[in-house]
Every structure is written in C-alpha cells, then in structure tokens.
Regions:
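Acyl-donor binding region in acyl/amide transferases
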Residues: 101-167, 174
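A conserved beta-strand-loop-helix scaffold within acyl/acetyltransferase catalytic domains
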Residues: 1-116, 162-163, 178, 194-200
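C-terminal domain-closing interface element
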Residues: 171-200
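Residue-level detector of functional hotspots within protein domains
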Residues: 20-22, 69, 90, 125-127, ...
Length: 200
C-alpha cells in the first residue's frame, strides 16, 4: 500500500489496458448483483459456512481439504476477518484474512458457485480495498500465482525453513536449493517487468 486513497487511486497507477481489464472483471461481478460483507468476531456458525465453501474447493478437484473445521475454529484468537460474497441474500463464497500490525494476509477461500472472476474479486480486490481502508502497509495474498502480477501484486522473495533429519537427503536438498535460487532470481527479475504499473 503506497498511501492509496481507495481502489480507484490504486488502479490509476496502472497502464490503461491493464486498468480496463480489472474494471471489466469487477463490473462483471457487480452486474451479477454480487455484494460483499466483512465479518469479524467470527461465530461457530460463520466458521461452519466458511468451511463448507473451503471444502467444496477441494471436492471439485476430487480431493479432501487438508485443514479441519476444528483447526479454523481455533484461529478465533487471531482476530481473523472473513469476507463473504453474497447474491440474492445467500452467501456464495468467502475468503479468510489475517492481520499483523502492518500487513493483511489473504490465505484461504472457497465458493459454492463457479463464477468467472469471483476468486479475484473476493480474495484480491476486496483484500486490496480492506488493506487501503485499514491503512495496512502491505497486503500479502499468498505465495505463487502468475495471475497476481497483472493485478498489481509485486513479486517478493520469500523463505521457508525446514530441518531434514537424514544428512544425505539434507545435502541433496541443499544443493538443489542453491541451484534453484539462481532460477528464482532470474524469474523475479522477469516478473518485475510484467507488472501493470505505468512507472515500471
């Protein structure tokens, strides 16, 4: 968040063609009369509905969700926010957000209906609006996703830490990571060139 006043201010920094694409995506959602509401102080009933959407996302791919409903209910002390998409008085999708002192984190989502651009609106555009509105310095929508670049998410290099007990396996992984880091650096530079901003 570079001190944007609102989503329009954020979009004003895009090149014209990319700005039009985002507006077109958002207009399609608005024309379907899909609205959004933020929920904090999340009750068990709200978690139940969120989890249904989350689980459906996996079921569509023939998979089981790797997190349980009980896991999500344990997160209440972290003061998360759920943004629900609703249409005709029914919730149809939801995205889960966490916050730190300066960062909004978008992590999990799910939908009852498969609607074009609903994922982008619920997880990214609503998240951007929330980050601007609550003056978060950063909005982290999660790792990976080429589609995030053209929506204004600048690439960052992240790290994860692991301990591998087997020393031979640990050495092989270490060597792979050293080699991979060169490819990541190259990809990072290429990703910067694809950003939609006028000053890039």
């Amino acid at each position: 968040n570079k001190g944007y006043e609102d989503f329009e201010d954020f979009l004003s920094k895009f090149v014209s063609r990319k700005r039009k694409n985002i507006k077109k995506e958002r207009d399609l959602i608005k024309r379907m009369n899909i609205k959004f509401k933020k929920v904090s102080n999340i009750s068990d009933t709200v978690w139940d509905e969120f989890y249904l959407f989350y689980a459906l996302t996996y079921a569509r791919r023939g998979q089981r969700p790797y997190l349980t409903l009980e896991f999500f209910k344990e997160l209440k002390n972290l003061d998360p926010i759920i943004i629900f998409a609703h249409k005709d008085d029914y919730n149809i999708a939801a995205a889960l957000f966490f916050k730190s002192s300066d960062t909004l984190y978008g992590r999990y989502w799910g939908a009852k209906e498969d609607i074009n651009f609903l994922h982008f609106e619920t997880c990214y555009y609503q998240g951007i609006e929330l980050a601007i509105e609550q003056k978060f310095k950063y909005f982290d929508p999660g790792i990976q996703g080429q589609h995030k670049l053209k929506r204004g998410f600048e690439p960052i290099i992240n790290s994860s830490y692991h301990w591998i007990k087997n020393s031979e396996f640990r050495t092989a992984i270490k060597n792979f990571c050293i080699e991979e880091s060169q490819h990541i650096e190259l990809y990072f530079k290429q990703a910067l060139k694809t950003l939609p901003f006028t000053n890039v």
